[in-house]
């Protein structure tokens, strides 16, 4: 694509813009050096406009540029719309009413259309600025491509260096593994080379002298009087099925509190007294004849309902008798 020539209007326009910038930012001020340097880099020149585009550059620009159209530039109707919206004339109005208001604004010269010559000049300025911007973009893309090519060319050397480093690391790992295996083998050899324990070293263990000392130690702890249990406290006298010793009755009476009545003397709740109340395991209980029940009491076919329901009675002579004819009277004085 061939370049364009700069028109007189554009040359004058660029000269006026340069004067305005230099008048605002003096060269004598050191703080304005950066601004003036940027102005020189972005200023549009005749060489920029005369530079033609190649086919590759045009294709790249078309693929990487998003086209935008500004419909508000040099449009008198846009200016009329801003004025009407500021006054609130278009609130809840139809499109037909809005178009009639635009025509009325132009007819009454509220806004005037821009001249065609003015619009053409402004379009020329915008085209020059766009070409300057496209040239800057192409130069920037070209520099990036050059950097990428140089990086790809230097990448084989870097890859060789990286492979060399990886090889060195793998060699170090293999050497460490070999050293660990050798140390493990040496440890196993040392363990196998240790002298075994002979039968002569184990002599004296389990002899008669050791057994004699162990038996003496056990006898000392077993025959300790502090831990010994008196046989009299464990031994219990047998109980007759028809009679009971007063010692057991007294011990049962002592366990009862003042509020609890003597159920055994009055012959009530006899079954609850004879029922075992211990929650311990059978192996932990002591076999005491005084606390054991006769099998005849447990068997249901030999229990007399009258003897269980009716309790004993005491007469004036102090003799305990049962209403059941089969039971024998109990002499309280002889028991005491």
Curated annotation (Swiss-Prot):
One of its GO terms (cellular component) is nucleus. Changing residue 145 to R: In strain: Zimbabwe 4 and Zimbabwe 70. GO terms for molecular function: telomeric DNA binding. Changing residue 212 to Q: In strain: Colombia 32, Mexico 12, North Carolina 19, Zimbabwe 4 and Zimbabwe 70. Changing residue 192 to V: In strain: Mexico 2, Mexico 23, Mexico 31, Zimbabwe 19, Zimbabwe 21 and Zimbabwe 50. GO terms for biological process: telomere capping. Residues 308-327 have a biased composition (Polar residues). Changing residue 193 to S: In strain: Zimbabwe 4. Keywords: Chromosome, DNA-binding, Nucleus, Repeat, Telomere. Residues 198-218, 308-336 are annotated as: Disordered. It is found in: Nucleus; Chromosome, Telomere. A motif (Su(var)205-binding Pro-containing repeat 1) lies at residues 225-231. The keyword DNA-binding applies. Residues 107-328 are annotated as: Required for binding to Su(var)205. Multiple telomeric associations (TAs) in the same metaphase spread often result in multicentric linear chromosomes that resemble little 'trains' of chromosomes, hence the name 'caravaggio', an Italian train. Binds to chromosome ends in a sequence-dependent manner and is required for telomere capping. Interacts (via C-terminus) with Su(var)205 dimer (via hinge and chromoshadow domain) and with moi to form the terminin, telomere-capping, complex. Interacts with HP6, which is also part of the terminin complex. This is Telomere-binding protein cav. The gene is cav.
């Amino acid at each position: 694509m061939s370049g364009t020539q700069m028109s007189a209007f554009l040359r004058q326009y660029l000269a006026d813009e340069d004067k305005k910038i230099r008048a605002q930012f003096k060269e004598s001020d050191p703080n304005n050096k950066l601004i003036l340097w940027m102005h020189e880099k972005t200023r549009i020149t005749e060489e920029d406009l005369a530079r033609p585009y190649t086919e590759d550059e045009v294709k790249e620009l078309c693929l990487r540029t998003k086209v935008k159209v500004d419909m508000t530039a040099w449009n008198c109707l846009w200016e009329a719309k801003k004025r009407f919206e500021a006054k609130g004339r278009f609130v809840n109005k139809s499109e037909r009413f809005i178009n009639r208001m635009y025509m009325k604004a132009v007819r009454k010269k509220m806004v005037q259309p821009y001249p065609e010559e003015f619009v053409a000049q402004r379009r020329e300025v915008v085209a020059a600025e766009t070409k300057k911007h496209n040239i800057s973009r192409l130069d920037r893309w070209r520099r990036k491509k050059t950097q990428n090519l140089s990086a790809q060319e230097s990448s084989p050397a870097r890859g060789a260096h990286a492979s060399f480093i990886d090889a060195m690391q793998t060699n170090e790992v293999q050497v460490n593994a070999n050293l660990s295996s050798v140390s493990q083998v040496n440890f196993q050899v040392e363990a196998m080379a240790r002298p075994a324990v002979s039968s002569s070293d184990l002599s004296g263990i389990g002899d008669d002298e050791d057994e004699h000392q162990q038996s003496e130690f056990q006898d000392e702890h077993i025959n300790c009087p502090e831990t010994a249990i008196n046989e009299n406290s464990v031994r219990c006298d047998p109980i007759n099925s028809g009679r009971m010793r007063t010692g057991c009755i007294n011990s049962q009476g002592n366990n009862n509190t003042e509020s609890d009545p003597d159920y055994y003397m009055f012959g009530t709740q006899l079954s609850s007294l004879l029922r075992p109340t211990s929650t311990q395991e059978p192996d932990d209980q002591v076999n005491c004849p005084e606390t054991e029940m006769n099998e005849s009491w447990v068997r249901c076919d030999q229990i007399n309902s009258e003897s269980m329901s009716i309790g004993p009675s005491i007469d004036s002579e102090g003799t305990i008798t049962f209403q059941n004819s089969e039971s024998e009277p109990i002499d309280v004085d002889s028991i005491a």
